């Protein structure tokens, strides 16, 4: 019940993040935007079916909290169905949802063209056949830190789809390293690449909706960027792009971002790990190293991957690499296996990193931090739209210091809702729950 109680304590604050307001004047030409639909990954849901997949079937063992969320979900759907009945002057309207898995073109860390995958979802209603609804708002959802490709947006019915319980258009990119590109390294915390991937997913997802959906947005629609954990940094990076490209912000009716538990200043996050002597989730260490080596080979020229690790870690590195590359375990399962390989339930940085890399005055450390600093979202721009952040002060994976860096940099442009005692998993669950229950 802890997470559920947290939810209702802060719903009034979180609801401030959900306002929308401009006429649908976006008439961008989508005819030349490449996309390809994957029929095997495209789905249709009734409201009941979506509720079952999100929260568990009625009477299942999904837990008391999920049962309450399921009830709220269906109550709000019923209220919206009643509104549609009044609007249409009839009875018997039933809400439903449709989602398309699609492929689109973007770029990898080397600037090479890649085909990526994503999912777009929107609401519809049934009355003598199915009819697409005009979306109120467009949401871009950057997925959280995931270790199992089955949790990629295009592969599953994810919590973010709870946003579609009214008339929303939801676009969720898999990003590099997941979906069709699951064999690739996740360019973790490389915000330049993630922004390019997300913009291309947005263009292609919108084109999919224009072809298969209603093709018309409601008056006063806005684009809102969402993201949690790994996706929070991606979301704020996309926010920065819009705030430094006025034409794009206007084109997409950009409103604001609402993120949770992210690494917005990667060098601050990394230095906090050093201050702590470790992190709640040890796999983030090799994932970050692999990403920086792949993303900035010139800046890390002369250093091999092995240079970052101690002998103890190197002895099991091939096994850990296989776990990371497999992308077929939950993060808890993967974390437990890595700790087993390291022979400790409380691994420190000394169990992973070399003495040289642990030295903040070493060349390898300074070069690595410079790579992270290229992705610092707390400097180099001035926000024009509100940044809303949910964070835990006791998050052992995504340090609160990173949220503080954004608040300190941008002051009143940033609204932070903080929880004192909540781990990373719980704060992410709270974010999902809050958005699923507040936005209708």
Name every feature range the model reports, one short phrase each.
Residues 188-212:
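Alpha/beta-hydrolase active-site loop
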Residues 17-20:
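C-terminal motif of bacterial Sec signal peptides marking the signal peptidase cleavage site
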Residues 37, 41, 260-380:
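Accessory cap/linker subdomain of secreted extracellular hydrolases
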Residues 110-117, 121-165, 174, 181:
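Short, surface-exposed "cap/lid" segments of acyl-processing enzymes
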Residues 27-126:
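Catalytic-loop region of hydrolases
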Residues 271, 364, 369-371, 397, ...:
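C-terminal catalytic histidine-bearing segment of alpha/beta-hydrolase fold enzymes
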Residues 204-280:
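Primarily recognizes the serine-hydrolase "nucleophile elbow" in alpha/beta-hydrolase
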């Amino acid at each position: 019940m802890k997470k559920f109680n947290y939810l209702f304590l802060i719903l009034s604050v979180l609801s401030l993040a959900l306002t929308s307001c401009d006429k649908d004047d976006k008439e961008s030409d989508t005819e030349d935007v490449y996309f390809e639909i994957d029929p095997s990954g495209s789905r249709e849901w009734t409201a009941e079916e979506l509720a079952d997949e999100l929260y568990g079937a009625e009477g299942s063992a999904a837990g008391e909290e999920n049962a309450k969320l399921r009830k709220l979900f269906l109550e709000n759907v019923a209220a919206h169905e009643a509104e549609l009945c009044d609007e249409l002057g009839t009875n018997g309207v039933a809400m439903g949802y449709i989602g398309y898995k699609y492929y689109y073109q973007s770029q990898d860390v080397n600037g090479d063209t890649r085909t990526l995958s994503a999912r777009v979802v929107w609401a519809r209603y049934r009355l003598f056949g199915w009819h697409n609804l005009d979306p109120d708002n467009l949401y871009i959802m950057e997925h959280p830190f995931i270790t199992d490709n089955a949790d990629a947006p295009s592969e599953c019915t994810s919590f973010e789809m709870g946003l579609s319980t009214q008339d929303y258009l939801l676009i969720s990119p898999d990003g590099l390293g997941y979906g069709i590109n699951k064999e690739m390294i996740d360019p973790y915390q490389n915000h330049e690449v993630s922004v390019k991937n997300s913009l291309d997913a947005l263009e292609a997802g919108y084109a999919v909706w224009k072809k298969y959906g209603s093709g018309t947005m409601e008056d006063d629609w806005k684009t809102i960027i969402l993201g949690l954990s790994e996706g929070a940094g991606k979301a704020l990076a996309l926010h920065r792009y819009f705030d430094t490209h006025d034409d794009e912000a206007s084109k997409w009716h950009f409103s604001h971002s609402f993120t949770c538990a992210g690494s917005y200043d990667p060098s601050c996050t990394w230095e906090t790990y050093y201050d702590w002597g470790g992190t709640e989730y040890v796999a983030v260490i090799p994932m970050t190293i692999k990403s920086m080596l792949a993303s900035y080979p010139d800046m890390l020229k002369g250093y091999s991957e092995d240079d970052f690790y101690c002998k103890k870690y190197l002895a099991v590195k091939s096994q850990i690499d296989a776990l990371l590359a497999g992308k077929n375990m939950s993060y808890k399962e993967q974390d437990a296996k890595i700790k087993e390989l390291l022979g400790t339930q409380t691994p420190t940085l000394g169990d992973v990193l070399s003495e040289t890399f642990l030295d903040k005055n070493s060349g390898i450390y300074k070069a690595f931090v410079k790579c992270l600093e290229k992705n610092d979202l707390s400097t180099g721009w001035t926000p024009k739209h509100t940044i809303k952040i949910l964070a835990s002060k006791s998050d052992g994976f995504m340090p609160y210091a990173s949220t503080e860096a954004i608040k300190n940099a941008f002051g009143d442009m940033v609204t932070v809702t903080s929880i004192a005692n909540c781990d990373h998993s719980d704060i992410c669950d709270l974010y999902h729950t809050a958005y699923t229950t507040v936005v209708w």
